[in-house]
C-alpha cells in the first residue's frame, strides 16, 4: 500500500467530515419538514463526532491535522460550494425548493463521505498491524451512521421532489421507516414505497 496515497485519503476524510458539519448546519436552516430537520440535527451531531474520530486517527498515526494537500483543497472547495448553493436557495427560492436543494447537497456530500469510509475499510484489510486496530475501531464507530446518512437522505430528496411535483409522497421516506443501512436495503425500500402510499 502506498503511504502517501493513504495519507491523502485521510486528509480528504478529515476535510469531508469538517465540511459535512457546515453542510448540515446550513441544511438544517433549509429544512421545513420537522422530521427531516430532526434527522439532520442528529446527523450533525454524529458528523461532529466523526471529525473527532478522524482526528484521533491522525493523532494515533502521527499526521498533522492542519496540513494541506491538493486533494484536501478540492474537497474543501466542494463543501464550500454545497453550502453556497444552499445559501443561494435560501435567499431566492421558495422554502420547499430550498429544502430540496439542501437534501441534494447532503446527498452529494454524503456520497463522498461514504466513499471515504468504504475506502478506509479496504485499506484496513491490507493495513500494517499497528494501523489496523486504529482503522477498525474508527470504522466500527462510523460505518452504520454513514450508511444511514446517505441512504436516508437520498430517500428524503426523492420524496421531497415527488411532493414538490404534486404527486403523493411517502413521509418519512421508506429508507428511514425501514432503517436501511445498505445499498440493497435502500433499493428494496425504494421498491416498497408504492405499498406505503
Region locations from a protein language model:
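A short N-terminal beta->alpha junction/helix N-cap motif
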Residues: 1-4, 8-15, 31-42
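Alpha-helix boundary/capping and short turn/kink residues
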Residues: 33, 63, 129-132
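Preference for long, well-ordered alpha-helical segments
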Residues: 102-193
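Alpha-helical membrane-targeting segments
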Residues: 4, 67-93, 97, 165-191, ...
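Membrane-interacting alpha-helical segments
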Residues: 1-7, 61-64, 97-100, 156-167
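Acidic/histidine-rich alpha-helical segments that form the ligand environment
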Residues: 6-29, 74-130, 137-140, 194-197
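Conserved alpha-helical segments that form or flank metal/cofactor-binding pockets of metalloenzymes
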Residues: 35-83, 153-156
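A short structural micro-motif
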Residues: 16, 46-50, 141-145
Amino acid at each position: 500500500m502506498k503511504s502517501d496515497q493513504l495519507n491523502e485519503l485521510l486528509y480528504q476524510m478529515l476535510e469531508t467530515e469538517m465540511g459535512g458539519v457546515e453542510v448540515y448546519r446550513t441544511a438544517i436552516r433549509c429544512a421545513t419538514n420537522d422530521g427531516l430537520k430532526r434527522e439532520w440535527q442528529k446527523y450533525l451531531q454524529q458528523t461532529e463526532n466523526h471529525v473527532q474520530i478522524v482526528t484521533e486517527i491522525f493523532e494515533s498515526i502521527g499526521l498533522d491535522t492542519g496540513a494541506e494537500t491538493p486533494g484536501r483543497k478540492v474537497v474543501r472547495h466542494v463543501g464550500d460550494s454545497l453550502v453556497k448553493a444552499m445559501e443561494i436557495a435560501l435567499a431566492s427560492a421558495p422554502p420547499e425548493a430550498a429544502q430540496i436543494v439542501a437534501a441534494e447537497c447532503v446527498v452529494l456530500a454524503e456520497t463522498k463521505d461514504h466513499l471515504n469510509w468504504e475506502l478506509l475499510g479496504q485499506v484496513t484489510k491490507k493495513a500494517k498491524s499497528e494501523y489496523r486496530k486504529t482503522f477498525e475501531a474508527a470504522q466500527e464507530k462510523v460505518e452504520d451512521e454513514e450508511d444511514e446518512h446517505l441512504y436516508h437522505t437520498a430517500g428524503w430528496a426523492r420524496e421531497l421532489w415527488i411532493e414538490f411535483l404534486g404527486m403523493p409522497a411517502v413521509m418519512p421516506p421508506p429508507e428511514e421507516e425501514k432503517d436501511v443501512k445498505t445499498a440493497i436495503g435502500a433499493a428494496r425500500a425504494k421498491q416498497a414505497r408504492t405499498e406505503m402510499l
